[in-house]
């Protein structure tokens, strides 16, 4: 299983959605119950260190003024006495329209039979309504109000999508700037994998050479099929599964001169259509002079 990312999310809680900058609290959310204290950073400098209460570190900003506008991040001290990575930056502007959300696709900006395509629209303020827009439509194609600062939309058609967030109906004039546009397509290929030699050194006949092929999906785990290629042709070889289903090892045992050549790998979704990734980067194995 994948290890949980310890990076905390940083959210903005407002007491009044209709006037979101009049009374603001920053919430730094812990990922487990053993975290001790947290730090708030503003514009790259440490601002404050405070205790975590429950799973949330709270830092009250109050009314947003010229003195406290800026880019905020947070991090948390764990029971192992290690600091987590800093959170993604959150901009406190005190102005409207509100800062644009981010929009990303999982597993990617594609429509593939058998796979669910999700668009994640992530803002910064809690208690907002998220709207998903498709180019050519005047009104949102989907809307969602969630307790967090992110909404997830499932899409089934190609097109150009963007999103924004807004205050609830009681304050309809408070909106964010739209996100960047994502182009959702039916792909010819999937993105190429990372490909490298695990025991990278000079090789001699009789050695074991282990290649690693890794598909770069960060949101979740998928059931993937991997293949190894030598000089552009599929090569039957032992596939070594590991705990991470997004990666495999290919073992070449007792290699000889015939195993020299240019290697690459590909992957595809087992439950999806027969669309493979582009060829990975190429690694050349030369058993006479070393790799």
Swiss-Prot record:
Glycosylation sites (chain numbering): 23, 156, 160, 175
SUPFAM superfamilies named among the record's database cross-references: Immunoglobulin
Post-translational changes noted in the entry: N-glycosylated.
Gene3D superfamilies per UniProt: Immunoglobulins (2.60.40.10)
PANTHER family reported for this sequence: MHC CLASS I NK CELL RECEPTOR, OSTEOCLAST-ASSOCIATED IMMUNOGLOBULIN-LIKE RECEPTOR
Tissues showing expression: Blood and milk.
A molecular function (GO) term: peptidase inhibitor activity
Transmembrane helix listed as a keyword: no
Cystine pairs: 28-74, 121-163, 213-265
BP terms from Gene Ontology: immune response-regulating signaling pathway
Entry annotated with the keyword Transmembrane helix: no
InterPro entries associated with the record: Ig-like_dom, Ig-like_dom_sf, Ig-like_fold, Ig-like_Receptors_ImmuneReg
Keywords, alphabetical: Disulfide bond, Glycoprotein, Immunoglobulin domain, Metalloenzyme inhibitor, Metalloprotease inhibitor, Protease inhibitor, Repeat
Protein name per the record: Venom metalloproteinase inhibitor DM43
Span of domain Ig-like V-type: 22-79, 114-171, 191-288
The organism's place on the tree of life at top rank: Eukaryota
Complex and partners: Homodimer.
Function: Metalloproteinase inhibitor.
Record organism: Didelphis marsupialis (Southern opossum)
GO cellular component entries: plasma membrane
